[in-house]
């Protein structure tokens, strides 16, 4: 590992740092040493973060015990974790991760953390002088024993760095396999719903006859940061950006100063807002040979930031407040295709997912013994970066329980179901098939616009449209009751646009089970 990933530990931006915090050559960037709670008098490098940068995991050559005092260059590399404390605006004291992550007697290096912070990718060297990529999962508050990823991610050649795209299915990784364009190349592969990986594809538009390294995909899903010895590098590795557009990666653009110098510049990670990131610097004013630094980008007013929504929160039992282990399935409502799925933390019920803008998302939340809950997130592509904290309650499957179907949409002033509704209706159909004796009422509600008579008629027709769709999916009509309530059961004021939107809804209630 020391010979394979030493380049990642040598992000030399010393010419631009003269103290713990200073402005770089560019007035839009501020560099700040993370301090002694994270850094040590040994080398600390390879920072990785989750999407909101609340968790920082990194690699260090510091001794694990008082008896283990060795020269920095001979010390084993191990993985440490630190968590951000909002009240102190700083990271907690770094803690050595357990043997499930740090295999004793080997070099272990953190190379990527998933957006939700529940999947950690690890580099480990092997007995043949090569290296492979391993993965550990967060189960409650414990990390699982790391498992070596299968082919086509790992090969007999050397694999050094990797990361997941926001969908959690697509992986980008660096490999020195002979089928590449030369040296270390960036490759990609996708895992299907059964856990099988596709063939690895070489990113030919980014790779060169020289070496590429340190691949990282931003939570927006379309911005790649990587390093290369080519593409007009100033010397050694330089950092570059490429954008994904219509399935193709753009020509790499150098990040310039202060990131690129005459030395090797590798491995930059940014949070979802793209206002801050972390990397390693060998600075004479730091604590050790290499320290971890916060890089803050001073965003101009005209810059909207990444076009994405960072949605996070917890799933819980509505009655008891107990946090739940649940599954979130995210659908592109316009196409009905699944974007991704993820699980909440089994101990805290928390989740976090990044949703690129310009898509109408339907999010279904399910847990054993509970009715599904649905969330609609529809952010225009022009909205820029938005962070939303949303706790999601689930109701047990009980007679009298009512839930709102948040992803049911009708044509304006009509009862015609729009295509965006089909995924939600299919979930309801599946629920009824899984509970073969369940009878439900489908109710539709309007706001106060229009006459009472008209609103009752429209809502009845809309409720019937839902019933008709479920019948077409094989649900017996005897199990379905359509009821239009018009404006008679508001859940919010009709004096505001927001209130009227809440009142326009479709619900189902369990009549018997």
Predicted feature residues:
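Short, acidic Ser/Thr/Gly-rich low-complexity loop/linker segments typical of extracellular
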Residues: 332-350
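Short, ordered, surface-exposed loop/turn motifs in non-cytosolic proteins
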Residues: 183, 318-335
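Periplasmic OmpA-like peptidoglycan-binding domain that tethers envelope proteins to the cell wall
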Residues: 73-76, 228, 233, 443-513
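Structured interaction patches on ligand/partner-binding surfaces of diverse proteins
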Residues: 368-391
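Bacterial Sec-dependent N-terminal signal peptides
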Residues: 1-25
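Short, conserved micro-motifs composed of acidic
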Residues: 21-314, 318-319, 359, 385-387, ...
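A short, solvent-exposed beta-strand micro-motif common in secreted/extracellular proteins
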Residues: 349, 359-369
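Short, solvent-exposed beta-strand/turn patches at coil↔beta or beta↔helix junctions
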Residues: 398-438, 446-454, 478
């Amino acid at each position: 590992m020391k010979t394979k990933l030493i380049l990642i530990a040598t992000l030399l931006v010393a010419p631009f740092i003269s103290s713990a915090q200073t402005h770089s050559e560019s007035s839009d960037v501020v560099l700040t040493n993370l301090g002694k709670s994270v850094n040590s008098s040994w080398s600390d490098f390879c920072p990785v973060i989750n999407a909101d940068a609340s968790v920082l995991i990194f690699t260090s050559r510091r001794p694990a015990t008082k008896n283990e005092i060795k020269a920095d260059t001979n010390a084993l590399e191990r993985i440490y974790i630190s968590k951000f404390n909002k009240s102190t605006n700083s990271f907690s004291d770094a803690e050595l991760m357990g043997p499930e992550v740090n295999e004793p007697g080997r070099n272990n290096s953190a190379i990527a953390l998933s957006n939700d912070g529940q999947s950690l990718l690890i580099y480990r060297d092997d007995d043949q002088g090569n290296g492979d990529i391993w993965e550990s999962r967060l189960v409650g508050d414990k990390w699982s024993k790391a498992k070596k990823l299968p082919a086509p991610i790992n090969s007999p050649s050397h694999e050094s760095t990797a990361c997941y795209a926001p969908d959690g299915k697509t992986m980008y990784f660096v490999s020195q396999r002979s089928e590449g364009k030369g040296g270390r190349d960036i490759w990609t592969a996708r895992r299907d719903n059964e856990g099988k990986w596709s063939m690895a594809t070489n990113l030919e538009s980014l790779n060169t006859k020289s070496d590429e390294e340190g691949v990282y995909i931003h939570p927006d899903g379309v911005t790649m940061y990587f390093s290369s010895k080519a593409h007009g590098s100033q010397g050694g590795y330089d950092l570059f950006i490429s954008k994904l557009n219509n399935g193709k990666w753009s020509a790499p653009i150098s990040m310039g100063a202060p990131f690129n110098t005459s030395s090797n510049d590798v491995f930059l990670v940014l949070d979802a807002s793209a206002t801050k990131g972390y990397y390693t610097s060998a600075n004479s004013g730091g604590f050790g040979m290499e320290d971890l630094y916060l890089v803050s980008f001073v965003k101009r007013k005209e810059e909207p930031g990444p076009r994405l929504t960072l949605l996070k929160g917890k799933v819980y039992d509505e009655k008891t407040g107990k946090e739940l282990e649940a599954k979130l399935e995210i659908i592109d409502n316009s196409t009905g295709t699944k974007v991704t799925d993820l699980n909440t933390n089994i101990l805290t019920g928390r989740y976090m997912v990044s949703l690129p803008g310009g898509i109408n998302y339907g999010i279904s939340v399910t847990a054993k013994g509970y009715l599904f809950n649905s969330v609609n997130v529809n952010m225009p592509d022009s909205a820029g970066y938005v962070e939303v904290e949303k706790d999601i309650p689930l109701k047990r499957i009980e007679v009298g329980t009512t839930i709102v179907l948040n992803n049911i949409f009708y044509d304006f002033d009509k009862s015609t179901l729009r295509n965006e509704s089909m995924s939600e209706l299919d979930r309801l159909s599946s629920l009824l098939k899984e509970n073969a004796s369940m009878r439900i009422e489908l109710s539709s509600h309007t706001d106060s616009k229009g006459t009472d008579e008209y609103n009752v008629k429209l809502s009845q027709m809309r409720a019937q449209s839902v019933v008709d769709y479920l019948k077409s999916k094989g649900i017996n009509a005897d199990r379905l009751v359509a009821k239009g309530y018009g404006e008679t059961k508001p859940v919010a004021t009709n004096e505001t646009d927001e209130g009227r939107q809440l009142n326009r809804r479709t619900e189902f209630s369990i009549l018997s089970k």
